[in-house]
Amino acid sequence: MTKDELKQRICESVDRRRSQIEGIGDQIMVNPELGFKEFETAKLVANTMEEFGFQTETGLARTGVKAVLKGKNPGPTVALIGELDSLGVADHPMVNPETGAAHACGHNAQI
């Protein structure tokens, strides 16, 4: 498979799951959690990755999630990182009244 064919396959896969991906992003947006307190977000990420067939490891650096998808052949390995913590900004229009947090930094756009 060429690089362009792989890119096309990935784009098609994302397009097929568009509503699910948007729903996850919306769920994270309305449930902001401060850094090292993203327990519900970590559960959501781990559960979603498991639904996609990844093996997950949770509790890394408190709320981190590692997801691994083994291929049929060895290598190459691709690594991605994402941050989904929010900020304590009490005056943000989408602040969570319970936590005082909001996704005001753009991390949630990684979804």
Q: Predicted segment positions?
A:
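Acidic/His- and Gly-rich active-site-bordering loop/insert found
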Residues: 3-104, 109-111
